[in-house]
Amino acid sequence: MAIESIKNRFAPVLAKREAEALYRRRPLVTSPQTAEMQINGLQVINFSSNDYLGLANHPALKHSCETIQDLSYGSGAAHLVTGHHLEHHLLEDELADWLGCERALLFSTGYMANLAVQQTLMQKGDWILADKLNHASLIDGARYSEADLKRYPHLDMQALEKRLQKAQQENRQCLIVTDGVFSMDGDCAPLQTIQALAKTYQAWLFLDDAHGFGTLGEQGKGTLAHFNLTPDENTIIMGTLGKAFGASGAFVAGSEVLVETLIQMARPYIYTTAMPPINARVARTALKQVQQADAEREQLKRNIQHFQTGANQLGLTLWPSDSAIQPIMLGRSAQAIQWSEALKQKGLWVTAIRPPTVPKNTARLRVTLSAAHTAEHIEKLLQALAQCQDDFPSSNT
């Protein structure tokens, strides 16, 4: 086989992506993260952020940043060397107390946390039972473990139970892995059923609640709380601090034994530098804001209802979602880009989501709503979507 240059191998791949309307580009932001922003030189209303409560630019978080004088910025080392600061420790304790778990453990990103849990806990011969629409980091974490990955159709509880029954017959340890709120669809996992199945078949449950924390449940405790459920000793929760919290980082919460096992054995935790202590301090402030954000959660609900009512009146095809994530299904990637670009020219930033992020022929506009959006923002979006329907008719709308 001839040796290739990087250019010769990948230039055709990139060209193919461009031709198929699958090429991705990074928007350049030149303003704070708010409902109204400057992106790629345009002044726009942002409907693509995960800043669900409008905390990313909150004065309390900014004030926390200004208290850095008693800290170094960098942590200087991994947690197990000299990088574990008191601010990290306090944040972990406060997150655990908030969720009613014995312990919590910080990670720099949700991706690292999802890799760590599955790589560490699951061994050869075990089964990971995963929803087919789980986030990419959950899929990667399963693939990088030694366990066998068994994916079940989206939200199909009968299919999940059949796999659990087979695993029980073969005496296999199972980990059920699911998003709480699915990031590209906005629908919720039926956690009452999933938790009951986990208990019946003695499986462990790993819940990625990145998009549920802050927005759902009492005090924003997430999808479990939304369904009036509590974690048990075999429940593992992953949450992120960069979405509704408006900060950065992630955590895993669960039992004492779980967290100590991750500290001792999780490679993505052990072999990386700890997040800056100031990030943990800001996240502690964000946690207090989230706990007190009942008014923002109510405003977010009103915004979701406002958008859904208007979109349904227009006859747009919405994915069944009651969360802040409201996908408008278009089907073809080219159509999704066409609509997205037209909206940008009207001062509205709505991202087109295309394969491979979502299945083939399910390209969509992913509208994400925030408590920071006003009724006027949403009306402007609905009017522009109506214009897109006239300008670019689609069989999916």
Swiss-Prot record:
The modification N6-(pyridoxal phosphate)lysine is found at residue 243. Pathway: Cofactor biosynthesis; biotin biosynthesis. One of its GO terms (biological process) is biotin biosynthetic process. The keyword Transmembrane does not apply. It is an enzyme of class 2 (transferase). Keywords: Biotin biosynthesis, Pyridoxal phosphate, Transferase. PROSITE patterns: AA_TRANSFER_CLASS_2. Its cofactor is pyridoxal 5'-phosphate. One of its GO terms (molecular function) is 8-amino-7-oxononanoate synthase activity. Its EC number is 2.3.1.47. Substrate binds at residues 24, 135, 357. Pyridoxal 5'-phosphate binds at residues 110-111, 183, 211, 240. Pfam families: Aminotran_1_2. It comes from the Bacteria. It catalyses: 6-carboxyhexanoyl-[ACP] + L-alanine + H(+) = (8S)-8-amino-7-oxononanoate + holo-[ACP] + CO2. Belongs to the class-II pyridoxal-phosphate-dependent aminotransferase family. BioF subfamily. Catalyzes the decarboxylative condensation of pimeloyl-[acyl-carrier protein] and L-alanine to produce 8-amino-7-oxononanoate (AON), [acyl-carrier protein], and carbon dioxide. Homodimer. This is 8-amino-7-oxononanoate synthase. It comes from Hydrogenovibrio crunogenus (strain DSM 25203 / XCL-2) (Thiomicrospira crunogena).
